[in-house]
Amino acid sequence: MKEAGFFLVVRFWIAPGGEEQVMRWMDGGHIAEVMRQPGFVWVKRLRMAEPDATGWSAHAMIYGIETRAHYDQYMGNHALHAKFANERAPFATKLRIERFAGEVDFSK
């Protein structure tokens, strides 16, 4: 397996009652489509131990990507991101998303 030199973390929160719909979308093809993008080598999904202050369940996706250039290519694919936004539209009020990315600067 290729090594990940760059990482994308997508934190997201799902409103009570919305988890089945959101996870069905993710597991039904969204994650696989992201993983087909050049340079994406692995993904982990986390369920956070505690909900947020409003009771929304907290989750995160951690994607291992070969290089920053692969990440930039993915982020520059506006058609793909528009497609994802369109797919999320039916449950947009049940989902909050925050993204951040970077390289490891410490590991033990």
Question: Which residues are covered by each model-predicted region?
Answer:
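Short, flexible turn/loop "capping" segments at secondary-structure junctions
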Residues: 1-6, 53-55
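Active-site-flanking beta-strand signature of metal-NTP-handling nucleotidyl enzymes
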Residues: 5-13, 61
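Short amphipathic alpha-helical segments
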Residues: 18-45, 83-84
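A general secondary-structure boundary signal
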Residues: 19, 23-27, 58, 96, ...
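An amphipathic, aromatic/His-enriched active-site/gating alpha helix that lines ligand/cofactor pockets
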Residues: 37-41, 54-56, 64-101
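Short, solvent-exposed loop/turn elements at beta->coil junctions and helix N-caps
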Residues: 46-51
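Short, low-order "capping/linker" segments at domain edges
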Residues: 103-108
